[in-house]
């Protein structure tokens, strides 16, 4: 009886915290089960699809339970966003990641040791450092959260060797429970996660991956651009269009805008202020379509996305499912559309060679790095260097794509950490106390305006390094961004603040001392096995796109080990099976309409067929028949007699 009462009291406290800080009346799905499991000190694995509310499952118990919750995540931009949002709610949160100064790291860790922080976000490569391990021993740790837990599994689609250090730091706090969270995991990965994190007992909570409100569509089309506009005109509401390259993002956004549909684009290469502005415009529905690389979407809270379109085919079903799942989080009808044709098959197969260059090439890149940075044998461990891939490739006559892949392989093998898109925003911490600040000799009016803007917009400035937006300060102080930068530098020189300017450059950190290139070990697990897994994932993605016999939703669920007995009745496969075959009369009408369009002897773009206002199934059959019988001809996207 006492145990039941204690359990109810704990649940009431969790629910009260949820209402107080997040405004939700109750937990949803398996959130409550996961929270109660971790509160009882049990190692727990939570499988929650995109939009399932993962962050609630560790943020709520972190506030209720004594001590600090350490959150391990590879997504630096996401951890910064979450820390900012938590601080805005009055919650003490901090982050440690590659690119921070030693002084910043020590200050942050000491705040955790002395009880000033409830949630500490850490990037996995920081777990290797002696500073972290020393301070971690002295922390009162409530539990450890491992976000994106599939990254610890060699069978996962995004394996990161730095995650293997989690099991090592667990030995420093053997009584602290582990909460592992992922949105995408096959049965094999589920078992591997629990084994590699040394779960004391298997304990899995899973939400069904079924999205009954989301219609999965594959469109086989040679003219993706026209089909995209056709889809955007057919489905109203907010949309995301995913592409693979930064240039493609800007090109497609321009193309959509030219069709009088408001669009912008987003990728990791944009300045933080530009990213924030574009993201806010899209979230507030000032812009309808966001064209983006896979850098966009993590942690984005926008439930009313009605459409997600992939113009370029992702490398894996895991990646596709996660990105497609950003549509329809409000539970209302939404669509996930993959535009596909035979050229995508060739592109996917080409990516194998790009992602897995020959071993000798990987070793050559490792040697060239050492020459580039003048790192001698048996030295270099812990050193970080700014890395300009274009300059490096010009120096040693390498190709950027293969070089990028070689560096990732070296990272998986544990030789380096390669941070490709750091988001090193400017940071400030006051060196003076609040009372000392008010007793300062009078500075310039500009300095006072900047200090006032800092105090008005940011909390925690006297105890933590806080991320700042110099453009926001400029707006508040009625100055230019450059003037704000100069003033912050002056305040730092006067020992009023610690100021770390914005820096956005990829960098490489040596995780161990340099060895000779011929002694670099690329094990079967790191290279051959990973390559085979990559090929298997690409094959699975191709099979999904080209399988027109099995319900799309059922295909996805089977891939993730979830059996489904009913078809969704809303994907393109299900609708094709239920739509009636065109009659002979309809087929003849469609053939005549196509021939009539082409009778002028000109080359006509295939998109003009949409203007015939004929049923798609009948039109497709008629087109296939006419091309097969050579009554008409297809050259790229153009039809002619």
What is the predicted role of each segment?
Residues 358-514, 519-622, 629-634:
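C-terminal accessory/connector segments of nucleic-acid motor ATPases
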Residues 2-21, 25-29, 33-55, 62-65, ...:
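Helicase motor core with emphasis on the C-terminal RecA-like subdomain
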Residues 23, 233, 611-614, 624:
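Amphipathic alpha-helical interaction elements
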Residues 212, 504, 637-638:
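Beta-strand-connecting loop/turn residues
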